[in-house]
Amino acid sequence: MMLRKFHGLIFLLVCAIHAHSDLAFSAEYRIGGVNPEALLCRPEGKGPFPAVVHNHGVGVDTVGYQKAVKRGYDLPGICKELAAGGFLTFVPIRQGGPGLRNLPPHKAQVLEAIDYMKRLADVDQSRIALTGNSRGGLLTLMVGVERSDLKALVIMAPAEIGRNFSNALSQISSLNAPVLLLVEKGDEPEFQNNFDALDRVLRENKKEFKSIRYDQGGGHSLFHTAGYYLQDIKVFLHDKLGGK
């Protein structure tokens, strides 16, 4: 009888650990390599540097880092381009796959990434920006309306997952950071509508922001590349974060 109870206790502990692991994310990262947990790109010179945490879209969650890069998802190029602009750039590769149920742990991973950056000696803790596209854009907004320590947000073609985008819009009054909002004209109606809704709510709440709807092609995939839009991001970040 005691042995049966002991086995039952072990089973419950294993289940509890497994359930908790869905939300847990290590603050230590395997940087770079074939199967990285994150990318980290440093500018030339000595810090402390202004910093960027970049949140990728759902394509990486769906097929994994290696396949996404082979399909044109140029996270290394984005990371290097932002670093060339003078920003120490960190790109966490989210764990857990796509879907609504993984959004809370993905949000927790963004928070962990910000805290990780604040511990780096060559990061200026007072000058950290959060950027992201699609699912990463939604996560950027969700975190941005809750934290007061972010210097700027860049939100590209944000997605609606469940009602999380709508819920974040209802919290815009608490937003402190200036926002750069981007979308490409050829993107799908969902992302155009989300762009318009966020633009409207930012305007109604008299928040500091700039919105750009590009008309140069690329659609939703534009923000998977290290493309022309990064120049606007670098100008915005230099204005809000300053140089080294």
Q: What do the PLM-derived regions correspond to, one by one?
A:
Residues 74, 100-121:
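Alpha/beta-hydrolase active-site loop
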Residues 55, 156, 214-215:
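Alpha/beta-hydrolase
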Residues 112-174:
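Primarily recognizes the serine-hydrolase "nucleophile elbow" in alpha/beta-hydrolase
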Residues 22-47:
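N-terminal cap/lid segment of alpha/beta-hydrolase-fold proteins
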Residues 55-57, 183:
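The conserved beta1-alpha1 loop
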Residues 47-49, 58-98:
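Short substrate-entry loop that stabilizes the transition state in hydrolases
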